Amino acid sequence: MEQLITPQKYVNPMIDVAFKYLFGTERNKHLLKGLLENVFKRKINDIIYDNTVQIGDTLESRSACFDVVCKSVDGPDFIVECQVRSQKYFAERAVFYSSRAITNQAPKGDWDYNFKPVYFLGLIDFALPESVGKSEGHVQSYSLRNDDNSTLMTDRVRYVFMEVEPFDKSYDECTNFEEKFLYYMKNLPTFADKPDTHNDKYFEELLMEAEYLKMDTETQAQYERRVKEMRDAKNVEEYARKKAIAEGREEGVALALKALSLLKEGRSVQEVCKETGLPEDKVRALAN
């Protein structure tokens, strides 16, 4: 019999089922709208979800990188992506998918390239590499600017990345909306009781909707399955690491972890064998 997950008071919003429930449903549209307004510093009259767009290319990749796509009725299109595992080219991925959102606006025939703005928000469970020109803090904002004088070339494309897991401030140390949002995104699952939000309406509503018991039975079951899958995957990864170390193969640790990462990205067993040099039986054992 499958062991049930003991629910916490609040769900983990970085798990895809919970994230979509909190920010990707009509019921909680106000939470996404408030997030986008505060992050991109602009008033949004209303948003419309675009469920026809799927960022992830495979089931495996969507479990690690999932998205909410929406359009504002009077302004930009938004891509909100949540990445729970480090990815080497995540910044480039953001540029690629925002570019796709732009080209999808092109009509058949003549076009003057007057496209709607596309804003990308990435919530990530890791730190961006220093190579992307990071500033201090855990909220990184990028736009297209002149290299010499930083004059804005166009406001039609913007990228904001919010580092959830590396965020280490207490609530009292938070000085703005973005930091408070990161605080709750990271710490929600650890709260046994409702924390003091200092009467902040947005976070009062976020906490209310993030209660596990607030979910319907079907969503609770989906959430529990995802928690179990993530725990199982973590255990497999740890087992592969310990087994390789026990056998005295440091190189084996790296290869096993690389193989696991490729499998989780949706790569076939044959592709993983070719890229890592591991035998097929070893790769299949990691996949099961």
Language-model segments: which ranges?
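Conserved single-residue anchors adjacent to enzymatic active/cofactor-binding motifs
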Residues: 1-220
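Short, charged alpha-helical interaction segments and adjacent helix-coil junctions
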Residues: 2-8, 78-83, 183-288
